[in-house]
C-alpha cells in the first residue's frame, strides 16, 4: 500500500477513537446529570410525603377543630365564683 493510504487509515482510526471517547464522556456526563436530577426529585417527593403532607394534615385538622370550638364557647362561671 502507498504510505499516503496508510497515513489516511491511521488518521481515520485515531479520529474514530477520539470520537468514541468524546461520545462516551458525553454520555457519562449526561447520565450523571440525569441521575442527580432523578435523585433530587426522589428526595423532594420523600420530603413532601414524610414531612409536608402530615404537617398540612395536622394544621388543617387543628384549624378545623379550633374553628369548631370557637363557635361553641362554654358558659361563663357563676358570679359567686368570682
Swiss-Prot record:
Localization, UniProt: Host Golgi apparatus membrane
Virion surface side: 1-16
Pfam family, one: CoV_E
Gene that encodes the chain: E
Chief location category: host cell
Membrane-spanning intervals of the chain: 17-37
Protein name: Envelope small membrane protein
Function, in words: Plays a central role in virus morphogenesis and assembly. Acts as a viroporin and self-assembles in host membranes forming pentameric protein-lipid pores that allow ion transport. Also plays a role in the induction of apoptosis.
GO CC entries: host cell Golgi apparatus; host cell Golgi membrane; membrane
ATP-binding is among the record's keywords: no
Residues on Intravirion side: 38-78
Species of provenance: Middle East respiratory syndrome-related coronavirus (isolate United Kingdom/H123990006/2012) (MERS-CoV)
Amino acid at each position: 500500500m502507498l504510505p499516503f493510504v496508510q497515513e489516511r487509515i491511521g488518521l481515520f482510526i485515531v479520529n474514530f477513537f477520539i470520537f468514541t471517547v468524546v461520545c462516551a464522556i458525553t454520555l457519562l456526563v449526561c447520565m450523571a446529570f440525569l441521575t442527580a436530577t432523578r435523585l433530587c426529585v426522589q428526595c423532594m417527593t420523600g420530603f413532601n410525603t414524610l414531612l409536608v403532607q402530615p404537617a398540612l394534615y395536622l394544621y388543617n385538622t387543628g384549624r378545623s377543630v379550633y374553628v369548631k370550638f370557637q363557635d361553641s364557647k362554654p358558659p361563663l362561671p357563676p358570679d359567686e365564683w368570682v
